[in-house]
């Protein structure tokens, strides 16, 4: 949906300005996200300490993406703490990828390897030209981030099924209501 692994992780907390919805409520939610993100085939047992580490990295990524580029005066200790969190995690090992004789890929590792992969993706994004195409959803309540790779660079929504269709439907209802008022 977002176009980047690090932004997918940042998107596991929704509606940050209003109804704050946590998608990583438990270690099993975290394991499911790791599988869906194709980081690990079998994350194995997860614990609350690992969950907290993943959430901490997620929040650091969100802070950095919203405040980047920092310019001459990084905005306070929160920014510096977030940068340190991402840089520390980027030094961790990556998931191990292996092919078997049939060509099947297996991805193994644990929380450290997932943190390493996500943090490196964040470092890559923040230091690349692609960062200039990073946007926040145009829905005022939605705080999902994405990379706009559309040809025109005019993508506005995190996803049509999520926010785009809701906005279009609301606009349609508003136009119909105004049209009805004008006709009476």
Q: What is the meaning of each model-derived region?
A:
Residues 20, 147, 168:
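Short acidic, gly/pro-rich beta-turn/loop elements at beta-sheet edges
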Residues 153-164:
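Cysteine-rich micro-motifs
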Residues 1-136, 143, 181-184:
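Short helix-coil boundary/hinge micro-motifs
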Residues 136-141, 160-162:
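Short, cysteine/histidine-rich loop/knuckle motifs that typically chelate Zn2+
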Residues 162-179:
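Basic DNA-binding region of bZIP-type proteins
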Residues 129-132, 149, 164:
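Residue-level signal for short amphipathic helical patches enriched in basic/charged
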Residues 143-148, 152:
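Histidine-centered nuclease catalytic patch
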